[in-house]
Amino acid sequence: MHPFSRLFRNIQSLGEEEVQELLGPPEDALPLLAGEDLNHRVADALNLHLPTADLQWVHKTNAITGLYSNQAAQFNPNWIQPEFPELHLHNDLIQKLQQYFGPLTINEKRKLQLNFPARFFPKATKYFPLIKGIKNNYPNFALEHFFATANYLWTLWEAGILYLRKNQTTLTFKGKPYSWEHRQLVQHNGQQHKSHLQSRQNSSMVACSGHLLHNHLSSESVSVSTRNLSNNISDKSQKSTRTGLCSYKQIQTDRLEHLARISCGSKIFIGQQGSSPKTLYKSISSNFRNQTWAYNSSRNSGHTTWFSSASNSNKSRSREKAYSSNSTSKRYSPPLNYEKSDFSSPGVRRRITRLDNNGTPTQCLWRSFYNTKPCGSYCIHHIVSSLDDWGPCTVTGDVTIKSPRTPRRITGGVFLVDKNPNNSSESRLVVDFSQFSRGHTRVHWPKFAVPNLQTLANLLSTNLQWLSLDVSAAFYHIPISPAAVPHLLVGSPGLERFYTCLSSSTHNRNNSQLQTMHNLCTRHVYSSLLLLFKTYGRKLHLLAHPFIMGFRKLPMGVGLSPFLLAQFTSALASMVRRNFPHCVVFAYMDDLVLGARTSEHLTAIYSHICSVFLDLGIHLNVNKTKWWGNHLHFMGYVITSSGVLPQDKHVKKISRYLHSVPVNQPLDYKICERLTGILNYVAPFTLCGYAALMPLYHAIASRMAFIFSSLYKSWLLSLYEELWPVVRQRGVVCTVFADATPTGWGIATTCQLLSGTFAFPLPIATAELIAACLARCWTGARLLGTDNSVVLSGKLTSFPWLLACVAHWILRGTSFCYVPSALNPADLPSRGLLPALRPLPRLRLRPQTSRISLWAASPPVSPRRPVRVAWSSPVQTCEPWIPP
C-alpha cells in the first residue's frame, strides 16, 4: 500500500481528483510530489512549520528530557564492584600466535604491533589539582561515593591495570612486567634490579657510608656536636685539597673501613641496639597503640612529631601481617598484602611524619585522631580507637620501574555509574579524559568504520548455527607504554581535603591543626564512616589517604581506545577465520561471533578458541557466552537467513515513546534530538526510512520547537508498526540502466529502450531519482546502473520531503552501480533519441562489506598444515565454504 494513501485522504486541502493523481502511476505522480507548492500545502496541513508565536516549550515527555531538565544521577549504596582476573597478555604474543595459527599476514602484524604496547602522546596535556580527582556527582552520598571510587581504583591497581605513583620518577604496580618494562626496572619482588644497582653503585657508596658514619657517631656519643663534626669534615677537606687526589681516596677508604668496623664490632644501628647487620633495612613494626601524638610547640617548625612510649617498648616487635578486613559484609573483599607502618625505637625522638610524593611532610589523619582526645560524641576518635592497627598509609607493588617526570596532578576525574541501563546493581568506573577531545589542543583520533546495517546483512545473514563470545574487561587487556603515564593520571585527594572542599570550613582561616581536623566530626560523617567501616574494615584508613595512579592498560575514556580494541579483536578474528575457513568469525569491539553449519562443529571450534585464548592471556566471559541457534542477536538486531530486523525491546520502546508524545504542544528541540536518535535506530526498517523524520531534522537544525500534529503522529505510528527486514545483497550483473535530463528520462535494458518527458523542468538530481524509481517500478530489477552520485549515495534527505518518502518506498532493497555518462546506454533515450540496441556494459555488483577493520579477506590455510579440529570436519575440505 502507498505510504501516503491514508495521509493524503485525511488532508482536507487536497481534492479527491488530486489525491487520485498523486496516488496514480509513478510517471505522473513522482514529478508532482517534487513540486514546491504541494510540499508547502501538506506541511501546512500537518502543522510541520516551525512555530512563530512565543509559546512555552515542553521540556519533558515520558523519560525524554530536554533543556533545563537534567536528569539527576542515582547513586546505589549497594553497588557491587566487579572483580578483575589477572589480565596479562603473553610477553611474546606475536610469536605465540604464530605457533597456533601459523605465519601472520602483514595486516595482522600491523594491528597487533599497534596494541603491543599502545602509545598515546598528545600535543598538550592539562594538569588539574588532586582535589578534582573524584568528581562529586552525588552530593547526597558524597562520602560513600568517595570511598567506593577510591576502592575501585585500588582494585584496578591490584589487578595490574594501574600504576601507583611513588614519586616524580618511579611507579609501582602488581603483576608481571612486560618486556618494555624490563628496561625500566628498579625493583622486582623486593630485590633491586641488576642494571639499576650497577648504575647507582659508584654514586651511592660514598653517600651511604657517610650517612651511616654520621648516624653511628651521633648514637655512640650524644656529646659530640654537629659543629665539631662539621669542623672535622672541613679539616679533612682542607687537607685533601692540599695533598691532592690521593689524600681524597685515602679519606674515602678510611670511611669505608670505619664503617666495616662499626658493622662487625659494635653492631649499633639506626634506631635499634643489638641488631644483626641483616636487619639494617628490615621494616620495624610496632603496635598502633604504642604511638603517641605530640605537637612541636615551636612556631618555626610547622610539622608534627611522633614519640614512642618507653613503657610499652617491649611489646613492639618486627612482623608482617596481611591486610585483612574485619568486615562482615561480602561486598568488597579484595586481598591486600600490606605491611605495618614503621615506628621509631624507644627513647629516641624521631620524625616519622609521612612524606607525600613531593617530599612535603603530611600528617596521617587516622593517627592524629587516635592520639587526640575526643571532641564530642560524634568524634572520629571513637572509630579510630576501635582498632589497634589500621595498617600502613600506602603500599608498594611487586615491581617498581622508572618513568618520565610525573607531576603530582591528575589529567582526568573519575566517578561511578551503573554498569548499563539494564544493570543497576553493579558499578562501572567512568574516566573523564575529555580534555583530549576538545579545544585547540584536541587529538584527532584515527577513524575506523563501524559496520552498517547492510554490511551486517551481507556478512551474517546466513543459515548457520551462531555463538557469541564476550571478552572480559576487553580494554584492560591492551597494555600501554609507561611513557604515556603522565598523560593518563587519576587519583584521590584524601578524605580531609575532599571533605574540606565540601563543607563550609573552607572559609575558616584559623591555622589551628586540631580545629581543622575536628571539622570532620559531624553526625553525618560519623554515621557514614561507621557504615563504611562495616564494608571496608581497616582498609578504610588506606582509602582515606591521597594517591595518584596512572593507567598501565588502555582506559575507556580516551578516543584512541575503541580504535585499538577494534584492531586487536579483528586481528584475532582474522587468524581464527584463516584456520577455520568453513566457519564465520566476526568481531566488533569486545564481541566475537562464531558461525558454523552444525552445532557439533561449532562446539569444537569454541573449545579450541577458548583454550588458545586462555593460553594467550585473553579472558572470555563465560557467563555471557550465548548459543543463539539460527537466530543471531547481535548489536541490537536479530539476524536470520531472511534478513535483519531490530530486537523486540527496541520496537516496544519506540512505540511507547511515540504514544507518549503530546499533540499540539511545542516540544523543546533537545527532546526532538533524543526522540530522533531513538527513531533512527529502527528507521531503515520502515517504508519511508530516514526521510519520514525530515521535519524533526529541520527543527533541530534551526534550534526551534516542534509541534506534533495528530495526523503526523498517527502517520509515524503506522510506519513504525510495519517493519520490513533488510536483506543481503546478491552478486548479480547489471542489466537495467537509467538516466535523465531536466526535461526527460530514459531507461535501457537488454531488450528494449524507454523514454519520456516531464511536464515541467526539474533539477537534475531530482530527475535522475525519478528515472531510477521508474526503472525499478517497470522492470523490477534490484540492481540499477546510473551516473548520478547523489542517487548512488542513497541519501534522500536532500530531496523534497514527499518525493524522498515515496522514492525510499520504491527503491527499498535496490542496489546501484556507477556507469560513466559516455558508457550509459540510457543517455541517448533520456535526450529523446532511440538508437539501435547495443551490448550493455558488463557491470557486476560486489556485495557491500564497507572498508571496515573488523572484516578482512584472509587467505585460506595451506593444505599441508595439520587440521585444527581433532575429528573429521562435516564440511568437505576440497571445496571449502567461503563466507559471503
Curated annotation (Swiss-Prot):
Mg(2+) binds at residues 470, 590-591. InterPro entries: DNA/RNA_pol_sf, DNApol_viral_C, DNApol_viral_N, HBV_DPOL, Hepadnavirus_pol/RT, Rev_trsase/Diguanyl_cyclase, RT_dom. Residues 388-729 are annotated as: Polymerase/reverse transcriptase domain (RT). Terminal protein domain (TP) is hepadnavirus-specific. Spacer domain is highly variable and separates the TP and RT domains. Polymerase/reverse-transcriptase domain (RT) and ribonuclease H domain (RH) are similar to retrovirus reverse transcriptase/RNase H. The polymerase/reverse transcriptase (RT) and ribonuclease H (RH) domains are structured in five subdomains: finger, palm, thumb, connection and RNase H. Within the palm subdomain, the 'primer grip' region is thought to be involved in the positioning of the primer terminus for accommodating the incoming nucleotide. The RH domain stabilizes the association of RT with primer-template. Keywords: DNA replication, DNA-binding, DNA-directed DNA polymerase, Endonuclease, Host-virus interaction, Hydrolase, Inhibition of host innate immune response by virus, Inhibition of host RLR pathway by virus, Magnesium, Metal-binding, Multifunctional enzyme, Nuclease, Nucleotidyltransferase, RNA-directed DNA polymerase, Transferase, Viral immunoevasion. PROSITE patterns: RT_POL. It comes from the Viruses. The gene is P. Activated by host HSP70 and HSP40 in vitro to be able to bind the epsilon loop of the pgRNA. Because deletion of the RNase H region renders the protein partly chaperone-independent, the chaperones may be needed indirectly to relieve occlusion of the RNA-binding site by this domain. Inhibited by several reverse-transcriptase inhibitors: Lamivudine, Adefovir and Entecavir. Gene3D superfamilies: 3.30.70.270. This is Protein P. Residues 299-345 are annotated as: Disordered. Residues 185-387 are annotated as: Spacer. GO terms for molecular function: DNA binding; DNA-directed DNA polymerase activity; metal ion binding; RNA-directed DNA polymerase activity; RNA-DNA hybrid ribonuclease activity. It catalyses: DNA(n) + a 2'-deoxyribonucleoside 5'-triphosphate = DNA(n+1) + diphosphate; Endonucleolytic cleavage to 5'-phosphomonoester. The record marks 68 as: Priming of reverse-transcription by covalently linking the first nucleotide of the (-)DNA. One of its GO terms (biological process) is DNA replication. Multifunctional enzyme that converts the viral RNA genome into dsDNA in viral cytoplasmic capsids. This enzyme displays a DNA polymerase activity that can copy either DNA or RNA templates, and a ribonuclease H (RNase H) activity that cleaves the RNA strand of RNA-DNA heteroduplexes in a partially processive 3'- to 5'-endonucleasic mode. Neo-synthesized pregenomic RNA (pgRNA) are encapsidated together with the P protein, and reverse-transcribed inside the nucleocapsid. Residues 1-184 are annotated as: Terminal protein domain (TP). Residues 398-639 form the Reverse transcriptase domain. Belongs to the hepadnaviridae P protein family. Hepadnaviral virions contain probably just one P protein molecule per particle. Its EC number is 2.7.7.7, 2.7.7.49, 3.1.26.4.
